[in-house]
Amino acid sequence: DSPGGASDAQKQ
């Protein structure tokens, strides 16, 4: 769901 990364924990 985050636009920049595949990791949901790291929201850019």
Curated annotation (Swiss-Prot):
Record keyword Iron-sulfur present: no
Subcellular location: Secreted, Extracellular space
Keyword Signal belongs to the record: no
Distribution of this protein across tissues and organs: Hemolymph.
Primary residence: secreted
The entry's keywords: Copper, Oxygen transport, Secreted, Transport
Signal peptide: none
A single Gene Ontology CC term: extracellular space
One of the record's GO molecular function terms: oxygen carrier activity
Family under the similarity heading: Belongs to the tyrosinase family. Hemocyanin subfamily.
Reported function: Hemocyanins are copper-containing oxygen carriers occurring freely dissolved in the hemolymph of many mollusks and arthropods.
Name the UniProt record assigns to this protein: Hemocyanin subunit 1
